[in-house]
């Protein structure tokens, strides 16, 4: 491929879009996967008002907008808005012409097949890209950690999944996915605040709660102990958060009660197993000979794994589940928020990958279903 045709890597998360150029060591732009539309009619004649705002601009004007996320649980639910997000990514953030660059997109495992077909169709027909590829998020995270064997526990805003990979081969029968992730924790946090008498209801206020969650939440090593401590010595746990209007809000036991749902989903009324059990079940679906290596290479990835103590707590929970002689090792790379993107950057700049792209010709010959044949 010629020098100017450097690939674009776009990791479309349910919560954030991470995008940049292949070969870079970090994404060039990261913005929320949000499309906002004005709630009120505009009466200021001459005021430049758009019918919709994307990403940070929507975030900044959120007070007057209704915000929508076009991706829910890793699946695109609104393709028109998704197109706007991609348009914003290429033209406003990266400032490139997509028709000149191959594009690598990412997707959660066990997604409906139509999702990636539609992605392929939009890339070739709307953005006219010369070539594209869709890769599974967890596999890219493993690339980024420099391993070829391990079980990736990826938890983002919309979906969490555990994917065992052995010597570079994904074991599809052992993939587990739970549709519980960061966004569910944000909603849970809103509920916890309501119990305290702080109501956050609008889509804009939800973003404030997300910020509180990201800045102040942590995972308790022992949930019951921590609850006891928060009742007896609440001052040790409480933190003050300043709201955009200058009011102060005290955040106490919510700090660990909110993310505890990752290990105990019944707290938010979900029947799915916790992250540790999901990972354990994935390992148990694998061949008995490779389990030891998987236990020893549990790799965290995604923004919802950024809580303090998550590695230690997961190690503790996995130790309780695994055979007593088993050595458990949880790897929590500091850049794990972006490890999917970093893995995509590594993959798309490998010389051996260049024959993997789906080209425009192949698309024109076979249509969108080509994506199932050429991408895992």
Swiss-Prot record:
It is found in: Cytoplasm; Cytoplasm, Cytoskeleton. Gene3D superfamilies: 3.30.420.40, Actin, Chain A, domain 4 (3.90.640.10). Keywords: ATP-binding, Cytoplasm, Cytoskeleton, Hydrolase, Methylation, Nucleotide-binding. One of its GO terms (cellular component) is actin filament. InterPro entries: Actin, Actin/actin-like_CS, Actin_CS, ATPase_NBD. The modification Tele-methylhistidine is found at residue 73. The keyword Transcription does not apply. Its main location: cytoplasm. One of its GO terms (molecular function) is ATP binding. Its EC number is 3.6.4.-. ACT1 and ACT2 differ in their polymerization, filament stability and helical structure. Unlike mammalian actin, Apicomplexa actins do not form long and stable filaments. Monomer (G-actin). Oligomer (F-actin). Polymerization of globular actin (G-actin) leads to a structural filament (F-actin) in the form of a two-stranded helix. Unlike for mammalian monomeric actin, monomeric actin is able to induce oligomerization with ATP or ADP. Mg(2+), which is used to coordinate ATP, is required for polymerization. Actin is a highly conserved protein that polymerizes to produce filaments that form cross-linked networks in the cytoplasm. Polymerizes into longer and more stable actin filaments compared to ACT1/actin-1. Has ATPase activity. ATP hydrolysis leads to the formation of a stable intermediate ADP-inorganic phosphate (Pi) actin, which is followed by the release of Pi. ATP hydrolysis affects filament stability; ADP-bound actin depolymerizes much faster than ATP- or ADP-Pi-bound actin. This is Actin-2. It comes from Plasmodium falciparum (isolate HB3).
